[in-house]
Amino acid sequence: MTVALPRTPSPLVRYIYVGRVETMSSKKLTVDAELEKLQQESFNYFLHETNPANGLVIDKTEADWPASIAATGLALASYPVAVERGFMPRAAAVERALTTLRFFWNSPQGPEPDTTGYHGFYYHFLDMQTGRRAWKCELSTVDSAFLLAGALTAGVYFAAHTPDEHEIRMLADALYRRADWQWTQDGGATVTHGWKSESGFLKYRWGGYDEALLLYILGLGSPTHPLPEESYAAWTSTYHWEHCYGQEYLYAGPLFTHQLSHVWIDFRGIQDSYMRDKGIDYFENSRRATYAQQLYAIDNPLKFEGYGRHCWGITASDGPGPDTIKVNGIERQFFNYVGRGVPYGPDDGTIAPWAAAASLPFAPEIVLPALDYCIHQAKLTELNSYGFKASFNPTYPGIFRDAHGWVSPWHYGLNQGPIILMIENYRTGLLWQLMRNCPYIASGLRRAGFAGGWL
């Protein structure tokens, strides 16, 4: 495929054609080296923001914050990348993975309010030290899916005939088999969002296209407590096909919903019944959603500062709010952490650079210039130990501003993981290759009606 170059190609894009680049900081780096630097900086979060005693990863870098089970699952999936890239010795990665899996296998499960989980699923947030439920939060089905996907990744990758790596494989398998997916349906056709010990199942169910694609594949693939095949059909019956900004695609507003399942599953060339009817696959769908994001930023219907061809990425992220103020005569509402989306909002001018990075496999021709902008013009990795900060907002006039506006003071584990893993899928397809070798993924895909391609 021939990609039309912009008149003044960014340093990252220019390398694709001429072999080496000179960036704005006058450092000569290949695209590969620049991407690897971003991967390593992002991985440093998991290296330094994990409790080595239990493997739990802090949700964000704010003091006294709890662990996120989704971030912990992304860390488990990132350890193979770290070994392959030389970010971490294999022995250290084995120790981290084994510590994490032992913790979850041995942690208390039950209906009591201060456990770690129930029915093989886990509370969304856990105390970093004790591993018990934090904030009276919900037991989260989708965040448990990210945790279990990470465990399965470790189980496939650590395949050496050593006692520790054998135990990793056994624990990953046991944790996955323990999850009672049928329980999460609460008698309904689809899966609930979660459960609380005080009040039972949450009233919300997974409906409409979103990151639950991974959840359903894992649930369908279970050899012990599988979801019925009808549950997947019930979920896809809630899909909404949309036409916006010249793109026809299966709609979901926040960009992360088009990315997170693709961290683990290579959807290129495989289709379920819904996608067969549309004549595309989920990978192509994510490419179109990525282009819709860029085109929305170019159009910039709400006239926010900074939006443009190389400045986009609207997703669930930190923000400068909650606040409502007048900016240049226009009353603007700003949010804190919320699931921002395109084109129907919410949108308050907040850009998340990790969202662009996680679309790299789908549309490198527009993602690489966006990364170049974030690194070399907005300088969102400068003076940061962990690569990109969570988000920035050029429109917001409050504190924590620099030349490019408000910048989040935090890093989030849920942002760091997709940067590492989707860059790696773009570079080598490592996660996709690993999970092709996971029989539960293949079984779940087939039971969902997927066929074709590598499957």
Where are these regions (language model features)?
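Extracellular and select intracellular beta-sandwich modules with Ser/Thr-enriched
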Residues: 8-14
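Ser/Thr/Asn(+Pro)-rich, low-complexity disordered segments
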Residues: 22-455
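Short, solvent-exposed loop/turn segments at the edges of extracellular beta-sandwich modules
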Residues: 1-8
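Short beta-strand edge segments in extracellular beta-sheet folds
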Residues: 15-21
